[in-house]
Every structure is written in C-alpha cells, then in structure tokens.
A protein has these predicted regions:
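Cleavable N-terminal export/targeting peptides
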Residues: 1-29
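Transmembrane beta-strands of outer-membrane beta-barrel pores
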Residues: 39-45, 80-86, 93, 117-123, ...
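Residues on the lipid-exposed face of transmembrane beta-strands in outer-membrane beta-barrel proteins
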Residues: 37-41, 62-68, 99-103, 117-119, ...
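Short glycine/proline- and aromatic-enriched beta-strand/turn motifs that initiate or cap beta-hairpins
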Residues: 23-85, 163, 177-189
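Repeated loop/turn-to-beta-strand initiation elements of outer-membrane beta-barrel proteins
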Residues: 72-76, 108-113, 146-151
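Helix-adjacent hinge/juxtasegments
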Residues: 89-122
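Residues that define the transmembrane beta-barrel architecture of outer-membrane proteins
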Residues: 31-33, 56-62, 91-97, 109, ...
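Extracellular loop and loop/strand-boundary signature of outer-membrane beta-barrel proteins
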Residues: 49-53, 85-88, 121-128, 167-173
Length: 189
C-alpha cells in the first residue's frame, strides 16, 4: 500500500507543478497521429466460478497507445495495457488489447476520459494462456511540456472475462481478471 501512496503522490505533484507553466508555454493542440507509452504500479484481482476470495497482487504495469485525432475533443486508437509479477517463482501476466476512445471535455485543457473494448488475457508461466472479452476505462491529464510532447499521469482500470485459466496444471473455470493502474506516460501528439 505504501507504493501506491508514493506513486500517487509523485503523479499528483508532477501534474500540479507542470500544469500551470506548461499551459502558458505550450497550448493543448491535438491533431493528426499520436503515440505514447508509460509505466507504473498495478494491482491485479482475480475471481472465478466456485472460488473463494483471491487476494489482490501488486506488480509492475505499463501501456502502449497510438491512434489518430478525430477532433480537438476526440481521439481514437489502439492500446495495450499489461501487468506482471513473479509470484512464488512463477511469472504471472495479465493484459488488455483494446480499441479505445479518448475524450477531452475541454479542448483547451489536458484532462481526458478514456474507454475501450477488445480482448483480455491471463497467463501463468509454463501454462497455456486464456483470452476473452475485455474492457478498459480511465482518466488522465496531458501536461504539455513541449510543442508536441506531454507527460501524462493516468489512473486506469481494465477488466477481462478470460474463461478457463490454468494454474499449476489445474483448470480454474470462469476466470475474470481486473487491474487498477496508476502510472506516468509519455505522449507525442
């Protein structure tokens, strides 16, 4: 829990410090192709048919996004969100690959809401992976620090219904995964 508090404080501080100066020097202009990536803290939760409560696991998370600008308020693109951790000597990964929309309520500001749908995955090292329907949503703020570059603090949530997962040779029926993510991204507009 300490890691979440520290990362949240750093992200909030970066957003506060950079917002005022960046707004005056580099206006929020969104047009054409955009691309970005980022890293941060993630918390994975699992549920399954007939399972008792499964504890959340904290780990490293990241994302990659790219797409095109539809208007000064709407961006459309594709993104990949991932989470990973070594648990008891086994590498566990979860992720989403989505078609996503980014909505900026006020075009002159950097605040945005995002949502997407696509595919989710879950895999434990040495086992076959599970893939199913996935959703993602979140919010963030593009802190413009250059003409075409922003630091982008984000808070995201992704969910997936990955079906039957495999753990240590055992089939886990009806597995659903979700990841909460807090991170810092780098975006080129």
């Amino acid at each position: 829990m300490r890691a979440v508090t520290r990362i949240s404080a750093v992200v909030a501080l970066l957003a506060l410090v950079g917002t005022t100066a960046a707004r005056a020097q580099h206006p929020q202009v969104r047009e054409g192709f955009w691309i970005g990536f980022g890293f941060g803290f993630g918390s994975l939760g699992l549920s399954c048919t007939g399972c008792s409560s499964i504890n959340r696991e904290s780990g490293i998370s990241g994302f990659l996004k790219m797409g095109g600008t539809v208007s000064d308020k709407l961006l459309l693109g594709g993104e990949s969100n991932g989470w990973t951790k070594d648990i008891g000597g086994t590498r566990v990964t979860a992720g989403n690959l989505s078609f996503a929309a980014y909505y900026y309520p006020s075009p002159a500001q950097g605040f945005f809401l995002r949502g997407g749908l696509g595919f989710a995955s879950y895999q434990e090292q040495g086992q076959s992976g599970s893939v199913g329907f996935g959703l993602t949503m979140g919010l963030g703020y593009d802190v413009r620090v250059g003409t075409n570059f922003s630091l982008t603090p984000v808070a995201n949530w992704s969910w997936g219904n990955v079906g039957d997962a495999h753990s240590g040779g055992i089939v886990i029926p009806g597995t659903k995964e979700n990841v909460f993510q807090v991170g810092l991204g780098f975006t080129w507009h």
